[in-house]
UniProtKB/Swiss-Prot annotation:
Name of protein: Potassium channel subfamily K member 17
InterPro entries reported for this sequence: 2pore_dom_K_chnl (IPR003280), 2pore_dom_K_chnl_TASK (IPR003092), K_chnl_dom (IPR013099)
Region (Selectivity filter 1): 116-121
Result for mutant: residue 88 to K: 7.3-fold increased current conductance when compared to wild-type
Intramembrane spans: 106-124, 211-230
Residue numbers binding K(+) 3: 118-119, 223-224
Glycosites: 65, 94
The species this protein was found in: Homo sapiens (Human)
Lineage: Eukaryota, Metazoa, Chordata, Craniata, Vertebrata
pH effect on activity, per entry: The homodimer is mainly inactive at pH range 6.0-7.5 and gated open at pH range 7.5-10.5. The heterodimer with KCNK5 or KCNK16 is gated open at physiological pH range 7-8 and increases current conductance at alkaline pH without apparent saturation.
Comment on protein domains: The pore-forming domains 1 and 2 assemble to form a single pore in which M2 and M4 transmembrane helices line the central cavity and M1 and M3 face the lipid bilayer. The transmembrane helices are bridged by the selectivity filters 1 and 2 carrying a signature sequence TxTTxGYGD that coordinate the permeant ions. Up to four ions can simultaneously occupy the selectivity filter and at least two elementary charges must translocate across the filter to convert it into the open conformation.
Description of how the protein assembles with itself and partners: Homodimer; disulfide-linked. Heterodimer with KCNK5 and KCNK16.
Alphabetically ordered keywords of this record: Cell membrane, Disulfide bond, Glycoprotein, Ion channel, Ion transport, Membrane, Metal-binding, Potassium, Potassium channel, Potassium transport, Transmembrane, Transmembrane helix, Transport, Voltage-gated channel
Bilayer topology annotation: Multi-pass membrane protein
Region (Disordered): 287-312
Length: 332
């Protein structure tokens, strides 16, 4: 018996919901920003005010104790100290820290520029360097995205390879995909987020929590600049340190991009934006999940050749664009 297909929901509107999905997404976005604003204001506002009052009090006491200093001269000294810090000097001891505009420091600055991390603790001061930085970033940022995409594709191929081998051994493709995806997630957590803080704790004198905070803020390209490697004036850093951290940033960003891609695929799935308004009937489930054979017996809706169901990490189904269009773009 022929049954008419249900009318598809208009584009930009969640099925069964009167509110457009774009409006719901914008409201959720603004609500999330409001949440962050309130929490950070509550946690950091009073501490910032106390720090400012303490600085002004110390400055006033310095002027009272050393009458030879006048206020303009002290303000000029403070500005010079701030500028010296921006130029790479650390005035906490008699010597400066790593020369950040030396060869290794310049390489690390180039990495932080094209990866858009931008810690903010170091910036070019000459006009020639600023102009070069503009063109360097214009070419380097797209190039970095291409490299990250290629590295992510290689990671996907590795996971797919292990999933196919495990599936052939166990004769259970679903379990193999789940195990391969979970292994990729756990190994990435270990290599890029859990183990590096141990190195940072040893080299920088940070706690493990501070090292983990730096690792995530760096790989997510947030880059506040409150924690930056190579800035401890009492530490002698080996030459390989920043180079190895640069490689960690490159591969870690590719791995984290896969995880963020999975989260985005879950958030952008139609019907999950407004789950309270989504109602699926038994007939809808039948029409989407089963087909009737010649004897009116339900048969499984198997994917076409070249199309694979989505695994637990959302990486098994990704194919080359041409193969996907040829195998999945038309209904059988």
């Amino acid at each position: 018996m022929y049954r008419p297909r249900a009318r598809a929901a208009p584009e930009g509107r969640v099925r069964g919901c009167a509110v457009p999905s774009t409006v719901l997404l914008l409201l959720a976005y603004l609500a999330y920003l409001a949440l962050g604003t309130g929490v950070f204001w509550t946690l950091e506002g009073r501490a910032a005010q106390d720090s400012s009052r303490s600085f002004q009090r110390d400055k006033w006491e310095l002027l009272q104790n050393f009458t030879c200093l006048d206020r303009p001269a002290l303000d000029s000294l403070i500005r010079d100290v701030v500028q010296a810090y921006k130029n790479g000097a650390s005035l906490l001891s008699n010597t400066t820290s790593m020369g950040r505009w030396e060869l290794v420091g310049s390489f690390f600055f180039s990495v932080s520029t094209i990866t858009t991390i931008g810690y903010g603790n170091l910036s070019p001061n000459t006009m020639a360097a600023r102009l070069f930085c503009i063109f360097f970033a214009l070419v380097g940022i797209p190039l970095n995205l291409v490299v990250l995409n290629r590295l992510g594709h290689l990671m996907q191929q590795g996971v797919n390879h292990w999933a196919s081998r495990l599936g052939g051994t166990w004769q259970d493709p679903d379990k193999a995909r789940w195990l391969a995806g979970s292994g990729a997630l756990l190994s990435g957590l270990l290599l890029f987020l859990l183990l590096p803080p141990l190195l940072f704790s040893h080299m920088e004198g940070w706690s493990y929590t501070e090292g983990f905070y730096f690792a995530f803020i760096t790989l997510s390209t947030v880059g506040f600049g409150d924690y930056v490697i190579g800035m401890n004036p009492s530490q002698r850093y080996p030459l390989w340190y920043k180079n190895m951290v640069s490689l960690w940033i490159l591969f870690g960003m590719a791995w984290l991009a896969l995880i963020i891609k999975l989260i985005l695929s879950q958030l952008e799935t139609p019907g999950r934006v407004c789950s309270c308004c989504h109602h699926s009937s038994k007939e809808d489930f039948k029409s989407q999940s089963w087909r009737q054979g010649p004897d009116r017996e339900p048969e499984s809706h198997s994917p076409q050749q070249g199309c694979y169901p989505e695994g637990p990490m959302g990486i098994i189904q990704h194919l080359e664009p041409s193969a996907h269009a040829a195998g999945c773009g038309k209904d059988s």
